[in-house]
UniProtKB/Swiss-Prot annotation:
Lineage per the UniProt record: Eukaryota, Metazoa, Chordata, Craniata, Vertebrata
Gene name tied to this protein: Gpbp1
Compositionally biased intervals (Polar residues): 94-117, 193-204, 248-286
Biased composition (Acidic residues): 456-473
Name of this chain's protein: Vasculin
Record localization: Nucleus
Sites bearing Phosphoserine, chain numbering: S49, S274, S276, S322, S381
Amino acid sequence: MAQHDFAPAWLNFPTPPSSTKSSLNFEKHSENFSWTENRYDVSRRRHNSSDGFDSGIGRPNGGNFGRKEKNGWRTHGRNGTENINHRGGYHGGNSRSRSSIFHSGKSQGLHENSIPDNETGRKEDKRERRQFEAEDFPSLNPEYEREPNQNKSLAAGVWDYPPNPKSRTPRMLVIKKGNTKDLQLSGFPVAGNLQSQPVKNGTGPSVYKGLVPKPAVPPTKPTQWKSQTKENKVGTSFSHESTYGVGNFNTFKSTAKNISPSTNSVKECNRSNSSSPVDKLNQQPRLTKLTRMRSDKKSEFLKALKRDRVEEEHEDESHAGSEKDDDSFNLHNSNTTHQERDINRNFDENEIPQENGNASMISQQIIRSSTFPQTDVLSSSLEAEHRLLKEMGWQEDSENDETCAPLTEDEMREFQVISEQLQKNGLRKNGILKNGLICDFKFGPWKNSTFKPTIENDDTETSSSDTSDDDDV
């Protein structure tokens, strides 16, 4: 297994010149053995490998593996240790003790030669590893901060050159201290540390109290407090977040604002904490009130609009020639219908001008009600039929009115008979027909009778289309 397979890319060990000396020394001693020459050629080609070919062939029991990995992968004297192991590899086991089997004198010299190489490699390795740990984990050994950065020029990248190298090490230290303090002091609802300032919202759970970052313990080091707020500004609020598992960003923003005094920041934390749920509680009923009022207005407006349009259509109809049999019934209902119409007219004058294009309809309605005051007989049945037709998917199309043929007297009589039957039998309840009499009714004549005046009068056409659009919306 080659070393570069599992070593990270930033772990660059420059190969020291001592390993080349040991390999030259080994070349002198290995002239007598052909198999060692072959092996050395292989290992020279692959001098990076920590294991060579021994792990599979020479040492089936893996006797020296752990030790050799320590020397071969970690240290700089890789060639020395490898080549010793190749010499003794075929005889299995611990290569240092058995390296004198073949040609004991020469291999003894080789053994002595490579020992100091290994020791120096180990020392370098320890020093580099300590420096690496200190660089990446400054909170583990604070002495590293006072040492000058020696190795920063060797490797490049984010590991060695962070975006802000000056503030990096103290900031990481502050994180460590803050975390230990928080973990020691917080038995989860921490009310004592906040200088007896509980969260103002009484309904909020005690988790909110634990979310305040707790600089309220009187700060012994003002510099640490400043650096902590600086850390919050830079954006490392994840430390507090990971401690509590819940992120409350209002508190971090407020602590970042107040750098110098600690009590102000705690007050602001409490304020921001308590204000958000209170605002939410206040806003929700306000929203529901608005929507409720709007829906009520709209529904009432639509109801009034339906009533007025039904009256209009009936007036058009009765004006077309059906004023014969209505007098007796009209006298009976005239008072109530006039009152309804007055109420509706007042309501519409207040409401309808908010919608677009309906002012003409108001004026027309007023003119009509003054000219034909006694023609509101069939309003209830018409309203029911109209509602049913709309539920079945029929729409008022003012464009198709010109194609309709003029009404005949037979059609008008048929319509009157049906409507009178409906009213006498009392088959209408809540605006819904209970039996299928509406099926015998021909849609064409009713539609034509409704829209006959609109052919003569252009204003009526526009007003009816406007009302139908508003009603469909």
